[in-house]
Amino acid sequence: MTISNAIEFKDVTFTYPESQAPVLKKINFKVKKGSWTALIGHNGSGKSTISKLINGLLLPDKDSGSVITVSGMNLNSKNVWDIREKVGIVFQNPDNQFVGATVGDDVAFGLENRGVPRDQMVQTVKKVLSDVGMLDYIDAEPANLSGGQKQRVAIAGILAVEPEIIILDESTSMLDPSGRDQILKIIKRLMSEKNLTILSITHDIDEADMADNVIVLNDGKILAQASPTEIFSQTEMPRQIGLDIPFVDKLIYKLNQLGITIPKDVQTKDELKQYLCQLNSKK
């Protein structure tokens, strides 16, 4: 059976035990296999709750009719461990994920838990550290790494166990712009090379702008879901819920207002620069 959607939520409702009102209310969305989807919204909108539901750390309200499907499996208490093998999460603070004395030990941790033979484990650790540009640090202590380097190691640890889906839960929010850009470029490359599905939970509009699809969450409900261009061209809607607009989308909006029509497939700074140069050369 061919699975087209890596993640699907149908009428998902969730209420925390100490809360009287649900934090998620009849949520419906799909994440296509092999795509990058960004989930954005203000604090308390329910973004991180969704990531915990996908990984089975939380379960939807009983008798609510909620259905969560991950990699073709309907999530329940019996198959939660099977689903967790399909999903890896990179959290905001990588220090909370380190368990090994060295970078190599840390990346090997998940493999050891799965009983992978040592020879295979050594090769896998070297391969995934090379994938994220951290092989030279295999014997380093995680505490001595920069924030960006720590996140690379965290990503390597996830890659080692070969998930189908990677959730970036505010995983670039503590990095400087340079470190953030490096991590996102690595993720984009690995997504293509390994056919990964990426769900990015973020406040960073520039990170969201790199996605194939954007879901806007507001007060436990989905406000909109479309391509980044479609979402951010609606300049008022993101601002109403406290989100800014990516610089390139602001610029495209202003150019369109001035009568310079920018094609919808122009989405990045480089694409806009190239289009404007071509436009200028025709004059």
Which residue ranges define each predicted feature?
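A short, flexible loop at the N-terminus of ABC-type nucleotide-binding domains that lies
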Residues: 2-6, 13-26, 59-62, 77-79
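Conserved ABC transporter NBD signature motif
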Residues: 63-74, 83
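Conserved ABC ATPase "signature" region
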Residues: 119-137
